[in-house]
Amino acid sequence: MSEDIRRGPGRPPKKRVVPNFERKGILEKPVRPQSRLEFSYDNPLIFKNLFIYFKNLKSKNILVRCTPTEITFFSRDQSQASFVIATIDGKNVNHYYASDVFWLGINRELVEKMFNSIDRSFLKITIVHRYDKPETLFFIFTDFDIDKECTYQITVSEPELDMDLIEMEKSISEERLKNYPLRWEFTSKQLKKTFSDLSNYTELVTIEKLGGDTPLHLYFQKFNSISYHEMYKSSNKINLTSTIPKSQVFQINVKIAHIKSLASAMVTDKIRILCEENGNLIFQSEMDALMLNTITLNNTI
């Protein structure tokens, strides 16, 4: 049977031509003279996924910090146990300009509705904040196939800063991250399954590792009832690394409800998990130019 007969009637699907966007990074001057902020990026779906994450965590208000080098989104989850800090470095996008350091406050539900209407036909997002309209943030989405631009004007405010939330940024500084004694990677599916299964039996789980080349352990034990032990024997399978001295044991107890809600909210396939001695956890994931950090405090147990 010939190839044409196997394919059946009708035209072959039209191949989409994707423009080649240059990533120029940080600009010294804006393209639009009135701009205080200009952000142009050829991956709008990254923003859609970020706001899906905020929605899944039931975040309410989002702080946006613009600096001459990067744009950062800060928020809390509904339980107030987890803090989200998502950063895009200006040098990794098509073009980026911010005149100085300033903050904007946006309502998550309002922006989320806008991103819900964005699909793969839009190949570029441009965000603009202008001196002459300080109460407005412009979102411009471009569909190059039919040369269409969709512009949304979202009302923003000069927010009251959540200093406890902003202070959490110190937990993910480059210097601080080097000193976390334990880190490993899970897929979002692994993370969700492990903590969903555990939640059927217990409220707390112990994370434990001996110093040296030893397995990672997750377990719980209820007196005269039930116990469970999960062991990861091959460190390379989960990219397990630690700085725990050979003679020591690293052990923390974690509230499962906090992790379960995060696991259900995740929008990336791979998650890096870092543990502090005080039991605080950091969940890191990357989406192209976006670095997403979620810090969960153990002292909320």
Curated annotation (Swiss-Prot):
Keywords: Host-virus interaction, Inhibition of host innate immune response by virus, Inhibition of host IRF3 by virus, Inhibition of host RLR pathway by virus, Late protein, Viral immunoevasion
Gene Ontology process terms (BP): symbiont-mediated suppression of host cytoplasmic pattern recognition receptor signaling pathway via inhibition of IRF3 activity
Gene3D superfamilies according to UniProt: 3.70.10.10
Inducing stimuli: Expressed in the late phase of the viral replicative cycle.
Function, as annotated: Plays a role in the inhibition of host innate immune system by acting as a negatively regulator of type I interferon production. Mechanistically, interacts with and prevents host IRF3 nuclear localization to inhibit its transcriptional activity.
Family, as annotated: Belongs to the asfivirus E301R family.
Binding partners and assembly: Interacts with host IRF3.
Miscellaneous comment in the UniProt entry for this protein: Shares some weak sequence similarity with PCNA (Proliferating cell nuclear antigen).
Record's protein name: Uncharacterized protein E301R
Organism in which the protein naturally occurs: African swine fever virus (strain Badajoz 1971 Vero-adapted)
Upper taxonomic lineage: Viruses, Varidnaviria, Bamfordvirae, Nucleocytoviricota, Pokkesviricetes
